[in-house]
Amino acid sequence: MIGLLLVLHGSKIKEWQEIVINYAEELKRHFPLVEYGFIEINEPKIDEAAKKLVERGADTIVVVPLLFAAGMHFKRDIPNQLKETSNKAKIIIAEPIGFDKRIVDILKEKAEKALSVEGTSYQ
């Protein structure tokens, strides 16, 4: 069975956890096993979330980093934190978000909304 593991940096700001919980809930419509883990600061850590997926029956875990680029967290920290779990399940790490034109639309929408709140429009 396939498990989906959302991975993000972590933050002392509570909203980070709320955001990933919302993404996880939406993704449960497409994947039966979804967990999330943080690289640092917050709980659960990546390895704990991966172990939970294995306990729930995952034999393959697709790790989806909520990161924009393949920096040290992507290249070093995520694989290192999943070493133990890789003996129990196949680990597939998806690419970071990177550049995606769909995100350009979201950024444009956010900018337009900010301008409208100020009572200004760029058009």
Curated annotation (Swiss-Prot):
The keyword DNA damage does not apply. Pfam families: CbiX. One of its GO terms (biological process) is anaerobic cobalamin biosynthetic process. Disulfide bonds: none annotated. Pathway: Cofactor biosynthesis; adenosylcobalamin biosynthesis; cob(II)yrinate a,c-diamide from sirohydrochlorin (anaerobic route): step 1/10. Its EC number is 4.99.1.3. Co(2+) binds at residues 9, 73. Signal peptide: none annotated. Substrate binds at residues 43, 68-73. The active site is at residue 9. Keywords: Cobalamin biosynthesis, Cobalt, Lyase, Metal-binding. It catalyses: Co-sirohydrochlorin + 2 H(+) = sirohydrochlorin + Co(2+). GO terms for molecular function: cobalt ion binding; sirohydrochlorin cobaltochelatase activity. Belongs to the CbiX family. CbiXS subfamily. Catalyzes the insertion of Co(2+) into sirohydrochlorin as part of the anaerobic pathway to cobalamin biosynthesis. Homotetramer; dimer of dimers. This is Sirohydrochlorin cobaltochelatase. It comes from Sulfolobus acidocaldarius (strain ATCC 33909 / DSM 639 / JCM 8929 / NBRC 15157 / NCIMB 11770). The lineage of its organism: Archaea, Thermoproteota, Thermoprotei, Sulfolobales, Sulfolobaceae.
